[in-house]
Amino acid sequence: MMEYPNQSGFRQRKLLPQVRMRGSAMEPSDPTQLFDDTSSGVNKHEPGRVGKSPDVFSGQNLLSDPMSNLAMAYGSSLASHGKEMMDKNLDRFIPISKLKYYFAVDTVYVGKKLGLLVFPYMHDNWEVNYQQDTPVAPRFDINAPDLYIPVMGFITYVLVAGLALGTQNRFSPEILGIQASSALVWLIIEVLAVLLSLYLVTVNTDLTTIDLVAFSGYKYVGMIVGVVAGLLFGRTGYYLALLWFCASIFVFTIRTLRLKILSEAAAEGRLVRGTKNQLRMYLTMAIAAAQPVFMYWLTFHLVR
């Protein structure tokens, strides 16, 4: 506050504006202050102490609590144990690791395998290659069974069947579902019948159920070609294509399975003689002869 004389000789006082620096605390008596100034980061009630959020202390206390650490360790152990049990039980019913082997294919393998299914007459070596008592992946051996071609063949067969039914104005989702279900049921019946026959004949073979599914699914290639030929060239084209692929799948199955079913006699260097070995030979021929029957049964009604 300053005093200066005026013309009348009296002194007048001039009030200077009160300036508050930014960041300084305001007096409690300031009527214009609505909230406490916390921008300085200093606690009013505890001068000189840096203020921290209570959440930080609660998080640190939680991490340093022995009971919390014990609960976290127990939860992690329980989760890992549950995952291990789930993988073990899942692998018991669905052998995921084995299925990966049957889908280890590439474009070169698929092309060669399809060519072998179309024309198997000039192929000489039908033995599956092994590496340390384990069969090599299908992409390295054309004789190894795979599931890629059978699975894609089944899906393509259902689509081609829907196309054939559509050209005849007989298509409906229900009929297509029945077509796919019947093909799947016949495949399951075929595999179960072969397994039962192998058990009754007491064949000592390394054939697995997945191998039988693969060999039974190769016939879908000929079925697809037969139906497409029927759509393009009529029933004559259908019968010609089906006849060719029936003969091809018969030769392919005979030459593939005889090394599996008759492997015991072949390993001992014995000829296929005796009642037991003759039963195995007849079983091999029966499995091969069943392929053309299923091919005709599942396709003849699709071509008119």
Curated annotation (Swiss-Prot):
It comes from the Eukaryota. It is found in: Endoplasmic reticulum membrane; Golgi apparatus membrane; Endoplasmic reticulum-Golgi intermediate compartment membrane. Keywords: Endoplasmic reticulum, Golgi apparatus, Membrane, Protein transport, Transmembrane, Transmembrane helix, Transport. Residues 21-54 are annotated as: Disordered. Signal peptide: none annotated. One of its GO terms (cellular component) is endoplasmic reticulum. The keyword Membrane applies. Residues 1-146, 204-212, 258-282 are cytoplasmic. The chain crosses the membrane at residues 147-167, 183-203, 213-233, 237-257, 283-303. Residues 168-182, 234-236, 304 are extracellular. One of its GO terms (biological process) is cilium assembly. It is a multi-pass membrane protein. Belongs to the YIF1 family. Functions in endoplasmic reticulum to Golgi vesicle-mediated transport and regulates the proper organization of the endoplasmic reticulum and the Golgi. Plays a key role in targeting to neuronal dendrites receptors such as HTR1A. Plays also a role in primary cilium and sperm flagellum assembly probably through protein transport to these compartments. This is Protein YIF1B. It comes from Danio rerio.
